[in-house]
Amino acid sequence: MAQRFKELYLQTIVPKLKDEFGYKNSHQVPEIKKIVINRGLGDASQNAKILDSSLNELSIIAGQRGVVTRSKKAIAGFKLRDKMAVGISVTLRGDRMYSFLDRLINLALPRIRDFQGISPKSFDGCGNYSLGLEEQLMFPEIDYDKIDQVRGMDISIVTTCSNNEEGVALLKNFGMPFKA
């Protein structure tokens, strides 16, 4: 699956973007550098099972084991001590990144209830796109009977684009379903 999206990028998207933006060199064409999947787990500090099940779910979705993010300092109001587990993060690059992007665009996003497309306003000004998902059940790898609680995740697609216009064009050519 990963090779399909990489081939699509090299064979189709690079020439399209070269014509559209007038790049002289194919190395000027923006590309996706990495995809970061993040899940904040505020309640994991009290319950270690939540952390383990979330780590397993994220590794099934991403195809790569996640890293536990820990708190930097203690905050008494949140019942949080220093270096306590507060989330999970996975950074995908290369073939795994293209494979995840393919599954996200073609399998997961269409399975969202009442889906009309994703917002084109979630770019950061430099062509990077952030997307929040409210549940993990949209991924076909997740078994409904094995989840203990519905949890969302944040997905950031980091590109080499210099502005939002290039980012929209790049992701649209990959087939990202933006709202009209």
Swiss-Prot record:
Q: Which GO terms describe its biological process?
A: translation
Lipid metabolism among keywords: no
Record-level GO cellular component terms: chloroplast; ribonucleoprotein complex; ribosome
The UniProt keyword set, sorted, is: Chloroplast, Plastid, Ribonucleoprotein, Ribosomal protein, RNA-binding, rRNA-binding
* Keyword Hydrolase (UniProt): no
Location, primary (coarse class)? plastid
Report the subcellular localization: Plastid, Chloroplast
* Superkingdom, taxonomy of origin: Eukaryota
Q: Which InterPro entries match?
A: Ribosomal_uL5, Ribosomal_uL5_bac-type, Ribosomal_uL5_C, Ribosomal_uL5_CS, Ribosomal_uL5_dom_sf, Ribosomal_uL5_N
One Pfam family, short name:
Ribosomal_L5_C
**Sorted alphabetically, which PROSITE patterns does this protein's record hold?**
RIBOSOMAL_L5 (PS00358)
* Disulfide-linked positions: none
For this UniProt entry, the molecular function terms from Gene Ontology, in alphabetical order, are: rRNA binding; structural constituent of ribosome
Q: Which family does it belong to?
A: Belongs to the universal ribosomal protein uL5 family.
What is the role of the protein in this entry? Binds 5S rRNA, forms part of the central protuberance of the 50S subunit.
Q: How does it assemble?
A: Part of the 50S ribosomal subunit; contacts the 5S rRNA.
Check the record and name the NCBIfam families matching this protein.
PRK00010.1
Q: Which HAMAP family match?
A: Ribosomal_uL5_B (MF_01333_B)
Q: What is this protein called?
A: Large ribosomal subunit protein uL5c
Q: Which organism is it from?
A: Oltmannsiellopsis viridis
Species lineage, top-down? Eukaryota, Viridiplantae, Chlorophyta, Ulvophyceae, Oltmannsiellopsidales
> Which gene underlies this protein?
rpl5
